[in-house]
Amino acid sequence: MNTNKILQADLEAYSLDETKIADVIVDSDMSYEEAVLNGLPKGCPEEILSKQVILEVYYLSFDGKIHKGQIVVDERVAKEVQEVFTVAFETKFQITSVIPISKFGWDDDKSMDVDNTSAFNYRTIANTDILSRHSRGWAVDINPRLNPHYRKDGEIVPPGGIYEAGKPGVLVEGDAIVKTFKKYCWGWGGNWIGEKDWQHFEKEEV
C-alpha cells in the first residue's frame, strides 16, 4: 500500500479538533490502489502516474454537516489545492462530495451526474483526441451540476445542470475559491470567451 501517496489534511488548518472529527461523515477513504490504480485507463505514462497523490480534504456539504473526502492531484499542485479546500471550509462554501473518479469507473459523466468534485482522470477532452489537464492531475472540477459547462454548440454538461449565481455551492467571479486558484495562476472556465465551464479550474504548467 502506497501510504506515502496519501497526504492527510492539516486539522489545524481546518480548525478541527477531536470532538468535531468524531462527527465527520466520511465520503471517501480509499487506498492509493483503489483511488489511482484500480481500473486506470490504458496508456497512462509512468511519468504522470508516479506524480499523483491523494489529498484528504474536509468540506461543508449540503446536509449542513462536515464531510471528509479525497481528491487525486499532481503532487506539485497538492499544497495549492489543499489551500483551496481550507478556504472553502473557512468560508462555508458547500460541496456535494469529493471522491476519486475511479469510484465511478473513470466515467466523468457518472461523476458529474451526482455533482461530485474530482481532479485526476486520464482522459481526452470531450469530442477530441487531446489529453485533458485532468490527465495530469492539473485540473479540478467543483460541484459540476451546480457549475455546469455551457458549450459553444449550446449543449449543457452535465445534462440538467443549471448555473444560478448566488446559490450555495455556485462559483462566481471574486469569491474566495476563485481568488485562491487565481493566486496560484490557475485558469477558470468561468472566464472563457464563447463558452463557460464554471466547474473547471486548470493549471497550464507546473
Where do the model's predicted regions map?
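Active-site acidic/histidine clusters and adjacent loop/turn architecture
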Residues: 47-111
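Generic structural hydrophobic/aromatic packing signal, biased to beta-strands
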Residues: 54-57, 84, 88, 120, ...
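Active-site-adjacent loop/helix surface patches within enzyme catalytic domains
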Residues: 94-136, 147-149
